[in-house]
């Protein structure tokens, strides 16, 4: 689906939190869908509301450029972030991630700046920052056309109360429509994939029935257009995951959407972690099937309280069909 104009995605939270949804790629302006993410009895609800509220816009500065080239020199994509909140609102902290060909991409935003996986940018109300996303593609071979997509994480370092872990809108993901990179040279191609922990199963009847009861139209299969990506928690309906003996078992479930090639990256404290010394998990989604990933992560060297989430991004030419999804963040307790 072709990109039209520039992307302006406004994150707006009114009293209650909201969850950002996948954008419509043909929309010139995309707004988040509002969802109440707070429980009425949450004892620290006011604090969560305050730190997870705001209004941010971001996008490409060059509205007309859809395609970039990599010829061995750095790719540079002009970009902006703007805090559109009122003067009495708080400073916004945004974590900015970049994905190339489905892989997390290290980059910098200044010519001599620090290369990082996530750049964290603070914005006062009404403040706007313009910069460039500067990088050498971590994936792709000469002759390929690969997708590149920036994604923001709202208030990335926020951690909820352990007794009642409500995130509000903290650590929610929003993304631009993808751009294309024509590979005139090979990318660095240093990242390694694993398929070891992946299995494919039928989507459970319970889930299918829930969808049938919710979406009654016979005109289309709603699961074909809705990506569902989940990380199982240790306690049902509670966003918390407990480790034991410096290890933690994780289970990821991915279903719905188109049949595409995807890459899954797991993050602890906003940094990608390896699985069996590999950088990401390679999967192929299938209509009517669920991808299940089970693995154990080593928590040696981590503090007691952490955040954990996973992001899945299409690879190859499939970025034109479907782009990026994130699990809800979980509070990871390292024992």
State where each predicted segment sits.
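Short beta-strand elements
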Residues: 158-214, 316-335
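Short acidic, flexible loop segments centered on an aromatic residue
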Residues: 86-106, 254-272
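Low-complexity, acidic Ser/Thr/Pro/Gly-rich terminal tails and inter-domain linkers that flank the onset
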Residues: 25-71, 199, 204-237
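Bacterial signal peptide processing site
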Residues: 19-21
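Intrinsically disordered, low-complexity Pro/Gly/Ser/Thr-rich segments with frequent PxxP/GP/PP motifs
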Residues: 110-140, 277-296
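C-terminal motif of bacterial Sec signal peptides marking the signal peptidase cleavage site
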Residues: 14-17
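Short glycine/proline/serine/threonine-rich loop/turn segments at secondary-structure transition edges
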Residues: 89, 138-149, 158-160, 300-309
């Amino acid at each position: 689906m072709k990109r039209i104009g520039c992307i302006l995605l406004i994150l707006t939270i009114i009293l209650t939190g909201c969850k950002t949804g996948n954008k419509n790629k043909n929309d010139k302006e995309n707004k988040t869908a509002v969802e109440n993410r707070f429980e009425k009895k949450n004892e620290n609800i006011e604090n969560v509301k305050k730190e997870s509220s705001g209004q941010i816009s971001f996008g490409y500065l060059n509205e007309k450029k859809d395609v970039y080239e990599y010829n061995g020199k750095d790719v540079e994509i002009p970009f902006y972030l703007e805090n559109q909140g009122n003067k009495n609102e708080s400073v916004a902290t945004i974590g900015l991630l970049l994905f190339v060909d489905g892989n997390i991409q290290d980059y910098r935003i200044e010519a001599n700046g620090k290369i990082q996986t996530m750049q964290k940018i603070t914005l006062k109300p009404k403040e706007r920052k313009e910069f460039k996303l500067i990088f050498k593609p971590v994936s792709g071979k000469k002759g390929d056309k690969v997708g590149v997509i920036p994604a923001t994480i709202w208030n990335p370092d926020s951690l909820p109360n352990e007794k009642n872990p409500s995130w509000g809108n903290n650590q929610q993901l929003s993304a631009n429509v993808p751009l294309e990179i024509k590979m005139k040279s090979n990318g660095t191609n240093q990242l390694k994939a694993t398929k070891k922990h992946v299995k494919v199963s039928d989507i459970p009847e319970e889930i299918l029935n829930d969808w049938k009861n919710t979406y009654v139209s016979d005109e289309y299969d709603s699961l074909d257009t809705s990506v569902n990506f989940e990380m199982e928690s240790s306690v049902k309906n509670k966003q918390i995951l407990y480790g034991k003996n410096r290890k933690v078992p994780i289970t990821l479930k991915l279903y719905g959407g188109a049949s595409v090639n995807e890459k899954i990256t797991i993050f602890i404290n906003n940094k990608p972690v390896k699985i069996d010394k590999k950088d990401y998990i390679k999967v192929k989604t299938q209509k009517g099937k669920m991808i299940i990933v089970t693995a154990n992560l080593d928590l040696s060297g981590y503090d007691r309280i952490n955040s954990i989430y996973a992001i899945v991004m299409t690879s190859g030419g499939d970025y034109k069909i479907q782009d990026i999804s994130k699990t809800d963040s979980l509070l990871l307790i390292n024992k």
